[in-house]
Amino acid sequence: MEIKELIAKATANMEKAVEYLDEQLSHVRAGKASPKLLDGIMVMYYGNATPLTQVASINTPDAKTIVVTPWERSLIKDIEKAIMDSPLGITPENNGELIRLGLPPLTEERRRQLVKQIKGDAEDAKVSVRNARRDAIDAIKKSVKTDGTPEDVAKDAEAEMQKVHDRYIKKIDELFAEKEKEIMTV
């Protein structure tokens, strides 16, 4: 494999790690109501587990409330049960037509738990980025031995790989810091 391809492949893997972290962080409740909080909830719909977003509309009328309006009234009990069974820890209010979810303010202890959780997620993303760099550098060194790639070209490629690595690690740190600030803001 050519060196440019190795760097491109490693960069793509690093980008995937950052995108995955961003997705993970979007599901962490930071005190503000967000429809994304309900993304992972599955509702039994005609015997099949179906994502809540496919059987109801989800709105946030204010920063502390999520409103779930089922497209079929008969689903309201199933939606309520799915939300209660989820790890969100939110008790739904069912008025027969829609479900309101009032988000209680986060306690200091819960905020610290969330920060600890996202710190672990960020560390996992960093490990993925480092692994992509290591694999690319190993492949570059191998190409020097087997394909006859010049040493100076290999050194330049390793330096380039390090720059890409540093850029993605910085991105991960920025995502973490932003989410941490969001969680810790009362």
Swiss-Prot record:
Listed SUPFAM superfamilies: Ribosome recycling factor, RRF (SSF55194)
Record's keyword annotation contains Protein biosynthesis: yes
Location of this chain's protein in the cell: Cytoplasm
GO MF annotations in UniProt: ribosomal large subunit binding
UniProt keyword annotation of Electron transport present: no
Keywords, ordered alphabetically: Cytoplasm, Protein biosynthesis
One BP annotation, GO: translational termination
PANTHER family tied to this protein: MITOCHONDRIAL RIBOSOME RECYCLING FACTOR PSEUDO 1 (PTHR20982:SF3), RIBOSOME RECYCLING FACTOR (PTHR20982)
Function of the protein: Responsible for the release of ribosomes from messenger RNA at the termination of protein biosynthesis. May increase the efficiency of translation by recycling ribosomes from one round of translation to another.
Record-stated family: Belongs to the RRF family.
Name listed for the protein in its UniProt record: Ribosome-recycling factor
Species in which this protein is naturally found: Porphyromonas gingivalis (strain ATCC 33277 / DSM 20709 / CIP 103683 / JCM 12257 / NCTC 11834 / 2561)
Gene: frr
